[in-house]
Structure formats: C-alpha cells, structure tokens
C-alpha cells in the first residue's frame, strides 16, 4: 500500500510551499487547538464541538502506520460533521499533515471512491444490457416469424413440436416475456443514463448527536456514542439474473420463457448521494488509543482518532448533566 510522506502528500495535493486557506481550521476561535493540547481528559462534547478532523478505523486494531482509515470526519464547530469515504488511506499517509491538508486528501479519496462505485455500476449494467438485448431481439424475431424456436416441448424446440391445443398459451407466454424484457431493458437504459450523468459532489456537513447511557444509578455514564449521517453513493446497477451468462442458447432462452423474461428489479435512485445513520461507540480498549506514527501523534477513542500533541491527556465520556447531548 502506497505511503505518502508530508512532501509527497503536499505535492499530490498541489499545495507546495503555499499555505492553503482550506477549511479555516487554523487560528479560528472554534478550532481544535485546545483539544490537541489538553492536559486533562477531554469529554466527547468538547472534542467534537470544536472544528477538527477525526479518522474512523477498525476499533479492534491499534493505530499504526499501515492501519487503514475507513472515513475521515470533518467537524465544523457548529454541531455538524461531513464524512469522506477513503479507498486507500492509512495513518502513515497523514504524517506531518495539517487538518486542512488531511481533509483535502480525504476529499480526493472520497472522489476516487465515487468514481470507482460509478464505474462498477456502469460496467455491471452495461454487461446486463449487452446480454439481454440480443436475447430479446432473437425472441422478438422468432415471434414475428411465427416459429417460436426457443420454446421447448419434451426436448424438441419450435412451435411445430407443440400440440395444437397448447400453442395459444405459447404465443401468450412469448408476448409476456417480450413485454417484460422490453420494460426491463428500458429501465436499464434509463438507469444507465442516470449513472452516466452523475457527477461528484463534496459531502455536506450534517448534524450529529452524542448519546450517553447511564449506569443503574442514573447518575454516572456507562457508555457514550457518536451518531451521524454517513455519506454513501447510490447508483443504478442491473444484473443479468440467470444461472448462466450465456443467453444465446435455446435452452437458456427456454428457461427465460418459463420465467417470463428478465426479472430486473433494480431501481433508479433519487440521487447518487445519500446517507445512512452510523453510530460509533466511544469506548476505550485495553491498549492505549494514543499512538505515535512516524512524527505524528494520534489520540481518541477506539476506532476514532484525531491528531494530538505528544503527552496528550486523552479523551473521556461526558457526564449526564452535560448540555447538548442525549441521555438515556
């Protein structure tokens, strides 16, 4: 997995020696400098209430240079958070980067994830259309010619092998299959047009919630979670949906006739950009969540970390009387 040094990361971002305006984290009153320098454990409401950048990773792992980052979260200091999907980012890649630079790198990762998901949907849908269109064309030609060659009757194919009294049913089956498959092809082509038109958009910052659970007494914290809307991409993706990808054989087309055509139940999303609720339990593992990677120190909760200064006191839960959080 490729690692980025500070110099190569800055070059990748096109920053060079120029200080970027970025997201306005540095020097503002709502910045996370107090969080980074804390001499006492920082409760969650303060940690996320200030503008800052946090990395989501596998909480069963200890932070290390090769540990993958799943998402980067940007808290705006006003109760909102934006989530960026990461394809190939590790803690080692963040060495020496500022919060602004991390978010810019995460944006590039998020756009790469969007492009990969879009291409996968385009490829799958195109494969399905390319498989089903010739199948439809063949069945339509057989119906137009009145031969119905794909119908099987005890191993023999063609309308002439079907008893006279059953032929009306064969014709009806053919027509139903053609109608269903044409509708499915029309939907697939519309879905493919949706995919092609989709263009990347940076995720929006949305409100997050801190939920605290109390112990049996109701007076002390027993657990706390960060709940937010995780951005996700939605594309139309059609699948061939038959046991064999070869739709050119009589036997396969006969099975299609029995199933009344292409059962394409894929739906066109309202938007390529959606979200799903995600909850991260702010728990501490048996090992320390403060870890130095190269020249950068990370601290936080299990599965959720931010850049801190060396000697940081760590992070903790809120108390039940903390304002602005949900309790039980």
Kindly give the residue locations of the regions a language model identified:
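Tryptophan-anchored aromatic micro-motifs
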Residues: 36-69
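N-terminal export leaders
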Residues: 9-10
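C-terminal motif of bacterial Sec signal peptides marking the signal peptidase cleavage site
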Residues: 24-27
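Sec-dependent signal peptide hydrophobic core
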Residues: 13-20
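N-terminal glycine/threonine-rich, aromatic-flanked beta-hairpin/loop signature
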Residues: 52-53, 62-239
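Edge beta-strand at a domain terminus
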Residues: 38, 260, 269-328
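Mature extracytoplasmic/lumenal regions of exported proteins
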Residues: 224-289, 293
């Amino acid at each position: 997995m490729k690692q980025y040094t500070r110099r190569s990361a800055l070059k990748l971002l096109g920053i060079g020696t120029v200080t970027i305006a970025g997201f306005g984290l540095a020097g503002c009153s709502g910045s996370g400098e107090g969080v980074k320098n804390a001499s006492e454990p920082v409760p969650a409401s303060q940690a996320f209430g200030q503008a800052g950048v946090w990395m989501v990773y596998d909480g069963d792992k200890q932070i290390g240079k090769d540990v993958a980052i799943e998402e980067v979260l940007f808290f705006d200091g006003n109760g909102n958070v934006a989530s960026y999907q990461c394809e190939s980012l590790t803690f080692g890649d963040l060495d020496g980067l500022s919060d602004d630079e991390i978010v810019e790198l995460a944006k590039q990762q998020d756009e790469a994830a969007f492009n990969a998901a879009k291409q996968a949907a385009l490829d799958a849908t195109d494969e399905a259309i390319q498989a089903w269109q010739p199948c439809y064309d063949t069945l339509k030609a057989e119906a137009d010619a009145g031969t119905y060659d794909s119908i099987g009757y005890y191993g023999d194919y063609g309308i002439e092998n079907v008893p006279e009294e059953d032929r009306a049913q064969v014709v009806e089956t053919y027509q139903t299959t053609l109608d269903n498959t044409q509708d499915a092809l029309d939907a697939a082509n519309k879905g493919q047009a949706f995919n092609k038109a989709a263009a990347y958009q940076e995720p929006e910052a949305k409100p997050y919630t801190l939920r605290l659970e109390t112990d049996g007494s109701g007076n002390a914290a027993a657990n706390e979670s960060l709940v937010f809307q995780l951005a996700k991409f939605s594309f139309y993706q059609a699948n061939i949906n038959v046991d064999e990808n070869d739709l050119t054989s009589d036997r396969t087309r006969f099975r299609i006739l029995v199933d009344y055509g292409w059962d394409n139940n894929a739906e066109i999303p309202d938007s390529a950009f959606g979200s799903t609720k995600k909850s991260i339990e702010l728990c501490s593992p048996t090992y320390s969540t403060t870890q130095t990677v190269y020249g950068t120190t990370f601290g936080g909760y299990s599965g959720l970390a931010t850049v801190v200064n060396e000697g940081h006191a760590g992070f903790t839960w809120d108390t039940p009387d903390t304002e602005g959080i949900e309790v039980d």
